[in-house]
């Protein structure tokens, strides 16, 4: 009997393929390490629409609310492009985030030494890179009211509202400082306090939270435009970057390209603690459903595997096991194993999705 519950939502496109490799790793932890999980599986996105006419059923939503963690593969694809907006596959993902109130989006950007030459930047700038961007996910300009397009006089006007409350900023700040304590004890908060009132409030609240509870963590502030420049100029100066929804959306994609491949990038979205002390949580690879390679065995499963490693660390407090899994991934890459997305100009023979999963399991067992 285990007290660790996990809901798997493979989704669409390459989602089921990469999730199958995570299943191998879950099975290995159970058989080799005695660390078992109560795993259930359900449909989301286009797969749920095909079966039920909606991208996420109420029953699946209820299940997601009750487990310790949700692990999602990918949603969407061209087959669903003409659906009504309300039932598009992506609406299932957005409903999960909204109803679980997953306000802290964690986007790591880590460059394994074996892949440093795949970055668009010089090896010496990115080799050894390991930063974490915490993006506030449920407020800000994407959600603020009023919003919309209307007519004033003879022209159309588009309006979006950047709005943050103290509570929304403070809970994101707490998450960032707690995260830094697990890492290298540094937080850089990014906003535009020089031109935006929401940025002024953001900086004030972050300072207040820091002064009250996290004096041991080094805090700095940076305007977000300078932050984007610094991510490209000298990314290794950062540990944890804390920022709002809009800037986080932009900065995390910028940081993603420092690492060489979207197929390598995991993410976590965390909410408030549940009764058992574990945060509500959903983990997913950053990459999409990749319909162009679906069913061909070409997908890179590493982002999904590293998303499970994040679940081990942040939902199940199994940091040593997360490090073991991340080390296995790094070791496989150091040995030269590459899926198609990681093939360099010198060519070579890529391995399949399944072969990559098998290689990582073999390293875990070594």
UniProtKB/Swiss-Prot annotation:
Site feature location: Important for catalysis: 142, 192
Residue sites binding NAD(+) per the record: 77-90, 288-300
Transmembrane segments: none
Compartments where located: Cytoplasm
Coiled coil: none
InterPro entries: IsoCit/isopropylmalate_DH_CS, IsoPropMal-DH-like_dom, Isopropylmalate_DH
EC number: 1.1.1.85
GO term, biological process aspect, one: L-leucine biosynthetic process
Purpose of the protein: Catalyzes the oxidation of 3-carboxy-2-hydroxy-4-methylpentanoate (3-isopropylmalate) to 3-carboxy-4-methyl-2-oxopentanoate. The product decarboxylates to 4-methyl-2 oxopentanoate.
Protein name according to UniProt: 3-isopropylmalate dehydrogenase
